[in-house]
């Protein structure tokens, strides 16, 4: 492809993983500020776990051998170590890491729920993480987990179903031509 972004998908996703790792591996206890700052940092660490989980999931779907009959997953760097020439993990290990990251994301973000700002489009909300995790579990055919996560989102009452007559107009930007 002549599209450099499409051609460099592997590299671009691993850049996200590297940046997420910097946050995930940050020692929150080294912060000098009050407990509120540590709680906010915990929330952002949760967001980083979510980004890493989604990145690993995208890499597994694009470059893992799950759907071609192989057993190779992807490379799972969870700490920065430029000298480590890490090989591919198995599909099972890759999926275990994705699930652990989604779980850590939800746990950390829910423990600092006061920092959840679903109206801020530059941040990942708790419900957005649950939706991403539900999508992952849908790929794994784990419908009980999907239902549990989706029920949590619905129970939050932050969203409503759009009436069928308003569906098309709901995609139109207000004030656009």
Which residues make up each language-model segment?
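Short coil/turn linking the two alpha-helices of tandem helical-hairpin repeats
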Residues: 60-67, 113, 139-142
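Hydrophobic-face positions in mid-chain alpha helices that act as interaction patches
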Residues: 141, 145-177
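Residue signature of alpha-solenoid helical repeat architecture, marking inter-repeat boundaries
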Residues: 43, 50, 93, 117-120, ...
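Inward-facing hydrophobic residues that define packing positions of alpha-helical scaffold repeats
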Residues: 17-20, 24, 95, 102, ...
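Short coil/linker segments at helix-helix boundaries
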Residues: 36-39, 62-92, 96
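Amphipathic alpha-helical segments of tetratricopeptide repeats
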Residues: 106-107, 114, 154-156
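Residue-level signature for tetratricopeptide repeat
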Residues: 55, 134-136
